[in-house]
Amino acid sequence: MLHRPRITPAVANARRAMLNTLPADLHNQLVLIALSGGRDSLAAMVIASWVIPRLNGRVGAVVVDHGLQENSARIADEVRIRAEQFALNPILIKRVSPSRVSAGPEASARIARYAAFYDALEETKAYAIILAHTLDDQAETVLLGLMRGSGPSSLRGMKAVSYTPEDCRYMNNKACNSVTAVYAHNTQRCSCDSTQRCSCDSRPYPPPPEPRNENRSYFPHPSCKCVEGSATRFTNADIDSRFGVFIRPFLDITRHETGKICEFYGLDYWNDPHNEDVRFSRVRIRHNVMPVLENEIGPGVKYALSRTAKLAQLDTEYLDHLSNELLDEIASKESDWSIRLPINTLQKTPVPIRLRVIRLAALQYFTVSLSFKHTRQIERLLCSSCDIKHVNLPRLITAQRVGNYIYMHTLRGKL
């Protein structure tokens, strides 16, 4: 009789985490695993190869070769072979060039990587991509956010499930709107976005997928048809189906556990040299900051940071939801290049909501992500006695007080 080893707690925890994150029935749709060859992504691959078929789904993989290592092409091919051994199909290898993006090395790699993910989603019409971020990654992300001083949003870290609109600004290296996606299923319409759970489904999001219309092109996302600088806001009516979903089922699984999973399955994983390069902020936090915190404060620091992220997500998502509703009510589009916001309403609005409305107006109408400084400057326009009357924003956008309104418009003219 063939003896099968008893699964370990790490394997059981990871299977349970993935089962709890995915819909109960995938309706034979494809889910891609983002594979790098590292322990986390290999652990996600083997767990997904067990979980997803049991949810009536198919498993494939996308391997992104950043070309930053001399042997990166060979590593990508080895990862493909390993994925084939676990019957993943299809397996896509996407070769990207992060150096072409004018940003820092970490941001450039991320932008190029997400562009490759979108290409893979479009090419395969996959339901989702699974990313193998762990609890350790979440803790590091929270610390990175605190370093940047970006307020409560820095504490919420990464979401277990996020939708294409959240990250579509990375598509084609150009900013796009944060748009609420509309889902149609179970004979009723259900508005779900990255800040809400599905109101007509008892399971955590994402909602159950529908069979895809193969005659339809799902990418680029409709929100990405925006032109930089135009005052065109895309709302629920612009999207009539579900698009790409990014799922992080391992946010409660530690890096130690993913190593144990690889050990259980006899998988040799690749250690990316960049994960040891202290030029990168995340690496310094991982190897220099976190060990000190664990030694000086206690071994539960990363768990506390992860728990903080979950609590912060609940608070910030609720505030974002209220802000979106208020923006829907008060914003008036004056032209293709101008909107206005009533000063009286903003003055009566609590500061946390007011600042969010200002930021959302700039982002959703002009695809401009405002800094805290610019947001505060626009807020000063609400004060009639203040000496400031207009604010110059990035990408030739201007905010100006005229009468009882704040006007935001682009200096590029009608687009």
Swiss-Prot record:
Pfam families in alphabetical order: ATP_bind_3
Any Gene Ontology CC annotation: cytoplasm
Alphabetized SUPFAM superfamilies for the sequence: Adenine nucleotide alpha hydrolases-like, MesJ substrate recognition domain-like
GO biological process: tRNA modification
Catalytic activity line of the entry: cytidine(34) in tRNA(Ile2) + L-lysine + ATP = lysidine(34) in tRNA(Ile2) + AMP + diphosphate + H(+)
EC category name: ligase
UniProt-annotated binding residues for ATP: S36, G37, G38, R39, D40, S41
Gene3D superfamilies: 1.20.59.20, HUPs
Domain of life: Bacteria
GO molecular function, one term: ATP binding
Subcellular location as annotated: Cytoplasm
Entry keywords, A to Z: ATP-binding, Cytoplasm, Ligase, Nucleotide-binding, tRNA processing
Function comment: Ligates lysine onto the cytidine present at position 34 of the AUA codon-specific tRNA(Ile) that contains the anticodon CAU, in an ATP-dependent manner. Cytidine is converted to lysidine, thus changing the amino acid specificity of the tRNA from methionine to isoleucine.
UniProt free text on domains: The N-terminal region contains the highly conserved SGGXDS motif, predicted to be a P-loop motif involved in ATP binding.
NCBIfam families: lysidine_TilS_N
Family note: Belongs to the tRNA(Ile)-lysidine synthase family.
The protein's name: tRNA(Ile)-lysidine synthase
Gene name of the encoded protein: tilS
